Structure formats: C-alpha cells, structure tokens
Amino acid sequence: MPAIRRFGTLRPVLAVLLLLAKVQSIEDHFSTQPEITNHLDRSEDTMADNSSSLDAQFVSQSNSFATKLYQRISAKHAGENVVISPFSISACLSLAAMGAGGLTAEQMYSVLEFGAPDRKQTVADNYRRLMERLATDSTVNVANKIYVMQNYAVKGAFNAIATGSFRSEAESVNFAESAAAAKKINGWVEEKTNNKIKDLISPDALDELSRMVLVNAVHFKGTWTYQFDPSLTRPFPFWLSETESRDVPMMNIKKHFAFNNFEELGFSALELTYGGSDMTMMLLLPNERMGLAALEEKLPTLNLAELAGKMHKQEVEVFLPKFKIEFTRDLNEDLQALGMERMFSDSAEFPDLLEQNEPLKVSKVVHKAFIEVNEEGTEAAAATAAVVRVKRALINRLKVRLDHPFLYALMMGSSRQTAFVGRLVKPDQSDVTQANRHEEL
C-alpha cells in the first residue's frame, strides 16, 4: 500500500481579468505621455480615517453581489462542481468602476450592490481597510495589477485610488505584441497564485486596440486548526443521485466545531477554522440527499453572519471528502444579464481612466478559480452531505457525513464577508486506492 502523503492545505485561488479596449479603430496620433504616477493624491479622499473596521453595509452589499452572481453561474453549470471568488470579481470590477462615468457607472455600482456612483469614496475607503486587514493575514495573498498600453498614461486621480485603496501597481506593455503581453500577464498571475492559475488570458484577446487590462489575483492557503489524520481517510460512497454513488477519499475527524441543524430551512451548517487566520469555511449540507437545488434557491434569504451567530460549538464527528476543483468562466454574459450592459457597448463611459481622451469599453471579463481541500487544510473549498447526513449517534454526539452535494463558503473575519463560494457535486475518485476500504459508519 502506497504511503499516505501528509501535504497540502485548504487553498482557494482565483484570478479575474478585465480587458478594456478602444471603441473604434482610428489612427493613433498620441505622442509619448508622461510616466504613470505612483504617488497617492489625498486631496479628495478621507484616508485620514484610521478606522480598521469594515462598514457593515459594505459587507452586506458584497455578499449580496456574491449570492446573485453565484446563482447565475451555478444555474449555467448544472450538475458541475463550481468555485468562484466573488471578492476577486467585485474587487476587479470596483477598480474599473472608479474610472467610470454616466450610465456605465450607474449600472456598475448598482449591480455591485453599492448603490449610486456618489458612494465612490465610501467604496474606496472600505477596500482600503479590507486590503490593509488582509495584508496582516499570512494565509491570504491579494494582488491587483493594471497593465496599460505603452505610450498611454493613467489619470492621476484614478492612479491614486488604485494604489491607495486597491494596492494596485501599473505597468506599461505593448498589447500589439499579443503573445509577449499575454505571457507577461499570465506570468504575474501564476506568481501571485502560487502557480495554481495558469493561462488566464490568451494572446488572441489582445491587440493594438487594447488599452488597459485590470487583473485581480487571490491566493489562500490555510491549515486547519484541527487537521484530519490521513490514516483515517478511507474510500466511502458519495451520492451523485438518489440511486448512484461513487467511492471517494473521505476524511474523518472528531473535534469541537460550530454546528447547527436548521431543520426549518432544510440544511445543517458546520464551520471549520484555520490556524493563524480569521478565515473560516462554512459547509451547508442539505438534509435531503438531493436537496442542493432547494438550498441554492434559498441563498438570497440567508445571511451567513447571522447563521454563524446561531451555531454552537459541540463535539462533532465529521466525514468530509477530499476534493480539488478548477473552474473558468467568461463573465461577460453573466454581468450583462445582471444589468452591467453599457460597459461592454460602444457607448461605454470610462472618462477617468486614461489621460488620453479616447472612448473605451470593456471587451472581456474572465474569471478562473482553483480550490483544493485535504487533510491538512484548504487551497479553495467545497463540501457535501447525505440524506440525513447530520444525525445524532449518541446524546450530545453528532455525526456529520458530507456524502452528497453541498455548498461551501470561505469567509473573512467576524463580518463573514464571502471570499470564495462554490459547491461539490462530483468529488474526484483519485487517491481512493491509497485508502483502506471504510468500515460501515
């Protein structure tokens, strides 16, 4: 029997790319522009506010956007494993919104749930606080980058917000040399995501009309507060339907975890924590074997922070499948369906991005995410349970079997802002041969 390897952690990784292009093809006649400024203009902001706490409304708005985007994407990928980072997508779009105007700005702020464009400074301040807080968490790496067509310059006010609130840096590239430009962008993304996200952008997405590429990359690698013992990981059935199952590597641990069975809502919730981080993973397990669709329909009415407040620490024996998910999606259609249409049209307004007075529009928004969950921890997450997977074995003793499709969310801090969200419906069968056949649980 092959030796069981003690490696890996729970690691969610994702990257979002937003590509802005020139609206129409006309002969370029701009001379070389001044270098992009790197100073932070504080004349019109409120950076003097030393508060490190996030606005509760900002968190609520962010989670609302996360829910509606997840519902849209998951509906388009029925029966598939899904993982996205609403935080990464929102951060990238929010940065672009800082340079938008007119109806374009109105639609972007509305879809992102931030209200109206007059909330611009409030949004920027909240991102500044969030980025400052995440910078102190060694398990999380958040990076933003702006790539600008050579001989073009970012406007000073936009650059001040980009560097001050989003900690983004700008770099000049020649998009006309598409292969070299794509290689540079993809190389940066790979570096920031520990080589988990590759080939985010293809060369054919870039050309001489490309003006700016905004990229957000997030990498989380957390070790469980209570690690699963690899010697207890064994093959166990995971139900794909009411009658079909497959054996998958099922991890096992018995510790005190925050838990509650919300019977009136039809699901149970379990929260796992990570050492040295305020990130947590919440697992939502339908009480019915095939109850995932019903649970997903309830998402808009669920407040994860409130759910967490109703959970109680108790001894729970947990059976959680190991899994790894990679997910890529072009978000153009999803964002337009949600109401963010104008930024993709020739009528798009982005007057505050570049010094050059040139019409710009968004040509592509791409999202790529990766997650892995094993005995040691996470690098992106997902989980599932079976028919009445949460049941009492003895008095004050719970057994939670995530052996059927379930939802999971990686959340940040006590505010429970959603960083990653997804579902597990078909765990990988890899590594099953490395585990002993599980006895009847």
Model-identified regions with their sequence ranges:
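Non-catalytic, conformational "gating/processing" segments within enzyme and secreted inhibitor domains
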Residues: 79, 115-289, 294, 309-394
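Extended hydrophobic
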Residues: 191, 214, 264-284, 389, ...
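Extracellular glycan-recognition regions
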Residues: 305
